[in-house]
């Protein structure tokens, strides 16, 4: 069920990050070097999840692995124990909550019309449902953290924190962001561009679907314009 996926990606996945933040406040102040294995594992896990995204053919699996990779960055940022890292982690959790939920919602609208989640079989939607393609484009741009979105602000804060702690981490972060951009564009091009493979008549999009997407992306854009609300 799509509602379960949306709640899981938007709220439940963030509870782990919230739990780590709360535990960090309870524990006595420790040197960041103690958390070095966890930081390296989180960054390496983010890259592996991103690489897994590149070889996915199932739309929902791709979005799910994308969520996992972003949570790796959140864990690494929290473990650094700096105000910037904490702000970046909180901002990324909120931004990615909106984005991943919107992507799952879009995946469901596509599935309801094609009855398949295979990327290559859902192509050509920009000719049939141009407004839905616009929502796909906006959601993917937010997922790959293009400015001026909150995703970009949060990833910039996390990148600054990790670079300040250890300059070598910029290699892992840069690689992670490059792969994120690659699979986000691949997902958009695979589902929207090219000739359509549908022979039957496609049902038009409903107002409730557009309202649902607007309620995901408009608040995110508004927070992006005034990030002081959460940072």
From Swiss-Prot:
Keyword field: Electron transport, Membrane, Mitochondrion, NAD, Respiratory chain, Translocase, Transmembrane, Transmembrane helix, Transport, Ubiquinone
A Pfam match: Proton_antipo_M
Highest taxon of the lineage: Eukaryota
Membrane-spanning parts: 1-21, 34-54, 61-80, 84-106, 118-138, 169-189
GO cellular component term of the entry, any: mitochondrial membrane
Subcellular location: Mitochondrion membrane
Protein name, entry field: NADH-ubiquinone oxidoreductase chain 4
Gene expressing this chain: MT-ND4
């Amino acid at each position: 069920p799509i509602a379960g996926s949306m709640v899981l990606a938007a709220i439940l996945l963030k509870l782990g990050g919230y739990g780590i933040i709360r535990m960090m406040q309870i524990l006595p102040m420790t040197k960041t070097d103690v958390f070095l294995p966890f930081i390296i594992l989180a960054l390496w896990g983010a890259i592996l999840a991103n690489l897994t995204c590149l070889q996915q053919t199932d739309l929902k699996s791709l979005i799910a692995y994308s969520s996992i990779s972003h949570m790796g960055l959140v864990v690494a940022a929290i473990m650094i124990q700096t105000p910037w890292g904490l702000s970046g982690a909180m901002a990324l959790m909120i931004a990615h909550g909106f984005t991943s939920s919107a992507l799952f919602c879009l995946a469901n609208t596509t599935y309801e019309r094609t009855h398949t989640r295979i990327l290559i079989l859902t192509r050509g939607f920009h000719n049939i449902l141009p407004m839905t393609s616009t929502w796909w484009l906006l959601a993917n741009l937010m997922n790959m953290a293009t400015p001026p979105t909150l995703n970009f602000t949060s990833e910039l804060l996390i990148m600054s924190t990790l670079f300040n702690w250890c300059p070598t981490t910029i290699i892992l972060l840069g690689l992670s962001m490059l792969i994120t951009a690659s699979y986000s564009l691949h997902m958009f091009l695979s589902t929207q561009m090219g000739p359509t493979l549908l022979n039957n008549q496609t049902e038009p999009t409903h107002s409730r679907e557009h309202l649902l997407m607007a309620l995901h992306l408009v608040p995110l854009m508004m927070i992006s314009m005034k990030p002081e609300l959460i940072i």
